[in-house]
C-alpha cells in the first residue's frame, strides 16, 4: 500500500498548489501516468510519483530511468489524444519524489525537461 500512500500524499500536495486532479493512474498499453493535474492557467501536468523509504538503492529521483521517461511521454501523448482529441495542448512532465516514509518523508516536485 506504500505506493498508493505516496500517490495520495503527492495528489494532496499538488492540489494544495491550486491544481485540479483530473485522473489517477492513467494506463495505456506499455505505460502509465500516476497523476494528471491541471494548473490554474490551464497547463496539464503529467506526474510520476516515486518514493524510497531508504537510500539503500539510491534516492527516489535516481529511480527514474530514461526508459520510464520515454514511457511517460508516450502515455501523456496517448492521454491528450484520447481525452482531448489532440496532442498539442500546453503540458509538461514532472516527478514528485518522497524520500523516507510516504506520510512524512521529504517531498519534492521536480520538473522534467523532455
Swiss-Prot record:
InterPro entries noted in UniProt: Restrct_endonuc-II-like, tRNA_endonuc-like_dom_sf, UPF0102_YraN-like
SUPFAM superfamilies named in the record: Restriction endonuclease-like
Molecular function GO labels: nucleic acid binding
NCBIfam families with a match to the protein in the record: PRK12497.1-3 (NF009150), YraN family protein (TIGR00252)
HAMAP family the record matches: UPF0102 (MF_00048)
Family statement drawn from the similarity comment of this UniProt entry: Belongs to the UPF0102 family.
PANTHER family (UniProt xref): UPF0102 PROTEIN YRAN
Protein name per Swiss-Prot or TrEMBL: UPF0102 protein Deide_03080
Organism: Deinococcus deserti (strain DSM 17065 / CIP 109153 / LMG 22923 / VCD115)
